[in-house]
Every structure is written in C-alpha cells, then in structure tokens.
Amino acid sequence: TLAHATEYFNHVELSKPQTLVLEIAVGTNYFFEIAKLRAIRLLFNLIASEYNQNWNCHLVVTPTKRNKTLYDYNVNMLRTTTECMSAILGGADTIANLPYDALYHKDNEFGDRIARNQLLILKNESYFDKVNNPSDGSYYIESLTQQLADKALVLFKDIEANGGFLKQLNEGIIKRKIQESADKEQDLFDAGKEILLGTNKHANKDDRMKHDLELFPFVKIKPRKTLITPIIEKRLAEKIEQERLEKE
C-alpha cells in the first residue's frame, strides 16, 4: 500500500495539499488490525514528509471477505462487528461495513440495515464516537504499532531498492509475494490451525444452502490476456463449502 502510494509522490506534482484515499480491508485479529491501521497512517505521514508532500491519507476500511462463510452465515455478523471495532480504534476515516449475507444474496434491505445497525450500536450504545484516538496510550497497541511499522518500512525499502512498486508489479513479484502469504494462511486453515467457527470447527451438518444462493459465492476465472497477472480474491472456506454443497 505504501509503495503504491509512493508512485503518486513520484509522478504527481501538485502544489496544493491533497488527500489520498487508501482502501484497506481488516480481519478478526483484533489488536493486529488496530495496529495495522495506525502503522499505515504513521508511515504514510513519514514518507510524505520525506517527499516534501503536504498530503493526507483518508483511510476507507471495510471487513475482509477472506474469513466470511456461506454456512452458519450469522457468524459473519460477529466477525464484521469486531472488524468494525478494530477499524474505529485504528483511526479509520470511513468505514464501509459488509452485510452478513453479501456472499450469497443480492443487495437487499435487510442485510444492509443489519450492517448499518452494527455501526449504530457501536456508536450509540458502545460510545465509540466519544473519544478521539482511544487506543493512544495503550502500551500493547503502541508497541505492536511500532513493530508493524518497523517491519513494513523494511519491506517498503526493499521494494524501492529493487525498482519500485510499478516495476515489481509488472514483473509479477508483488503478486507472487501476496500469493505466498495467502497460500500459507490457506494451509493453516486446511490443517485446522486457522479456525472459522461453523465451518471447519463446530459445523452444523444440518445446514442447507444450495437453494438460498442468489449469487455465485466462489472464485470466478475468465481467462484472457492481461498486462499484469491479476490477484484473485479467494475466501478460506471455499473448498469446504463446495464439497458440502455437492453433498446436499
């Protein structure tokens, strides 16, 4: 993300202050996600100052689809609630919640209302809007933020030293690194070390979803020539879910 943002500093010359919108997904690793967002803002401001750019970053944060599930779908509400909490405490400027049924239902009033009400509960009943930067001063979060920032800065410098983001993107290096990380997480899930309740642990074998699908909830691939090999969005539970659907 930061290496990508740097390409704007390299190629866009503007005298007036600008705002760069960064779209970030968050998962259920609660404190990690809080620290991740804080580290992104910290490093963005650091890099912008090094480029003598008076730019601000506007963080648009949304829950990831990576850990969302088709079966026992109500658990998705719990996942998105903690993810939105992380987004708030991490300093997100805008939060776009994900409806619990977004994987298999078309946009609908009920799913959208639940997603909206989750944020309203955090605001009006948990009072998340009453304190600015509520995670400031927490030793654990501050320490984790600094650790993530240090590691991210090393990775950023490595990308810049090897030609920058666009060069590595064109050469497939960025895609390969992301794929390697995704494969490691998938292996953990397949081995039962990464848990999704209701899917690979405590699954309800009586759940039936085949006749509720309004949308195709799995990876779609349409082979065609591209300048850059695309990064394909894929959820952890797809293989298990496909096997269960075939048995219904």
Regions found by a protein language model. Give the residues of each.
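Helix-rich catalytic cores of soluble enzyme domains
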Residues: 1-87, 99-116
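Residue-level detector of short coil/turn "hinge" positions at structural boundaries
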Residues: 16, 51, 55, 93-94, ...
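Short acidic/histidine-rich active-site segments
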Residues: 91-105, 128-135
